[in-house]
Amino acid sequence: MLKIIIDFDDTLFPTSEKVIEVYNKRHNTKLDFAQITNYNLYDNFEVETADELIELFVEKCVYDSLQPYKGAVRTVKSLIEQGHEVYVATATDVRNMEWKEELLQKHFPFIPKKNLIRIHNKALLNADVMIEDKLDNLKSTFAERICFNQHWNIDDDADYVYSIFRTHHWGEINNIINEIERNNRQWKG
């Protein structure tokens, strides 16, 4: 049984895509999600635009119709059924925590409410496996690392140096977890 920490934004749910969508509707613009090539929004957009995008992360309208990534519900449910301990961690503003709790209960009712954790330094959670889109979080943990591929986390050197498994969709996660378990059993003898 593994203790698995899963990041909420842009790993379980495409939150940044939704933020861009809401921004474009409000301003009749055509910002492109693919423009986000750095985790820090200020490195991707003008200051005023980045400020507004960051504020959208705490607006309820972003979360009202947010859906999990394809395959996430089935995969997370399967991990729990296999006996793994699953937690969802988010480095979020307290103003949107309630909406994140509602989304988890709606789409992932099999994850206990107490397993949603608001924390900035996820490495403190002492996980066996961390599934995350932010490379800095993956680099700071001793857990097995699974990087949920996004435009802002492409770094082949980090993948190699930090032994990061990279996934492009939730359908690959079970196989990666199984490989991690096999490697752990072989290592322990």
Put a short name on every predicted segment:
Residues M1-E52:
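Active-site neighborhood of HAD-like aspartate-dependent phosphohydrolases
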Residues F13-S16, E21, V86-V88, R95-W99, ...:
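Short catalytic/ligand-binding loop motif for oxyanion handling, primarily in non-cytosolic enzymes
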Residues L31, N38-K77:
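Metal-dependent phosphoesterase signature
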Residues Y63-Q67, A72-L104:
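Substrate-recognition element of Asp-dependent hydrolases with the DxDx(T/V) motif
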Residues E85-Y87, V129, I146:
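A structural signal for isolated positions on well-ordered beta-strands in alpha/beta enzyme cores
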Residues L103-I119, Y160-I177:
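Structural recognition of alpha->loop->beta junctions
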Residues K114-F142:
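Conserved Lys-Pro-Asp/Glu-containing loop-to-beta segment of HAD-superfamily phosphomonoesterases
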Residues I131-H168:
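Acidic, Mg2+-coordinating phosphoryl-transfer loop and its flanking beta/alpha structural elements
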